Amino acid sequence: MVIDPYRTRTAALADEHLAINPGTDAALALGLMHVILSMDLEDREYVAACTNGFEELRAHALKPEYSPESVAKATGIDAGVIVRLARAYAAAGRNGSARPAVIRLNYGIQRSENGGTAARAVCMLPLLTGSWKYKGGGLQLSTSGSFPFNEKALQRPELMLASPLGRAARVVNMSQLGQALTSLGDGTDDGPRVKALFVYNSNPAAVAPNQNDVLRGMRRDDLFTVVHEQFFTDTADYADVLLPAPTFLEVKDVQGAYGHLFAQVSNRAIAPLGEARSNVAMFGELGRRMGFDEACFDDREDELIDQALKTENPWFAGITRERLEREGHVPLQMPVDANGDVLPFSTAEWFKTASGRGELLPVPVFAAPTESRAHAAEGAYPLEFLPRKADNYMNSTFANIPLHQRMEARLAGVLEMHATDAAARQIATGDAVEVFNGRGSIMLRALVNAQVSAGVVAARLDWSKLGSDLSGNRANVNALTSETLTDIGGGATFYSTLVEVRKGQDDVR
């Protein structure tokens, strides 16, 4: 079963696709808890041994606002389907069932205003049903957190506190770059105006939210901008100084993973071309030229890899740079059960929380995103907008490659919308349409289909500097997104965006 507001290729292959309303995943998770707990379907033995806060969560989830009927109104998923899903999920793997329940969480759930709460709520489901006890059960988002690299040795926070300015350096959230470049230093107590921008490993002119403010800030005459890049990206066009960067083939690094449990070293295939310098070499030399005399500015890749692997965590026991260079990849030394299987969170020993258990506190509370259909009737923008990732690009990376452009051509510059919304606006497939809100607008071609539900429209982040919207403006979906941050972690809220759509001029290209 796939739960997604968009009918993805994965959803099309699933036994069942639930087209949930954007930003309502926390409500669905709490609705599933309501059914599980009201029917006493939780694994009481596991809950008692491995969780903290069960009674508080139980009382909260059994509130009327999380009944299947209430949750159905928020999520758009039928109450009967919610009950059926909860019962099937709780039963999987138990009472002789051969297939345990596993949840494959992905990153999209986090990109809503309540995304942190949503992710927490979903993660509580296997804590209630005990599906962690079964091989193949539980939940996966990413295995990246399983690699206990010594981040403190790499980040050196004590040097930040020893700033010659007498205070810690100001931190600006990268998802609020537009605000930082246009509003910081405007006379409030948020510090001085940003006067220099150093961009590496990113293309904020294309991928940062609230694109119009980002570009307005980058066009400031008094902003000194340095861009360290491999290609002439959107951001490179705004650089006062453009420095050549190597590709991953030209640098050495230690690697964790998103989906496996092997530590690796990636060696250089070739030396850096031309004058390209790695991040390590560039910032080391820059630090020296700025007068810093700490030894860390002389560290190079081998020294940093050694520092990253130097930790007391037993999962890295016996894993050294020399061994990784010799063997290529080495499995993490994780605990195994009597059968030799790794069963994470199957016992309380796995939880590295203050209580030593899976935390159910504070209880998750569903609140609809400010920009969502729950509030759409209050303003001029009634449609929820999904700025989807392209299948053949990584954000804006690879968007300059003709082969990838050809593979993306079918949905490039396209707005997908439901027939109900299209008919209400007298829009047909192929029409030029303007998608707009108070932050900006883009021109696209309409594609009327059933990939989205009524009230939802979708378009892909599929332009680099080599492309533009239909009006000829170099704008993409981020002209519409906001700099509002998620409730946990301060992430971007790309999927909490309201828009309106109107038919455009026929003479746009």
Residue ranges: model-predicted function:
Residues V214, R220-F224, H228-F231, V265-R288, ...:
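Phosphate/diphosphate-binding loops
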Residues Y6-R9, F232-S266:
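Flexible glycine/proline-rich, aromatic-decorated loop/lid segments
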Residues L13-A14, G53, P64-S70, R104-I109, ...:
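Flexible glycine/proline-enriched surface loops and loop-helix/loop-strand junctions
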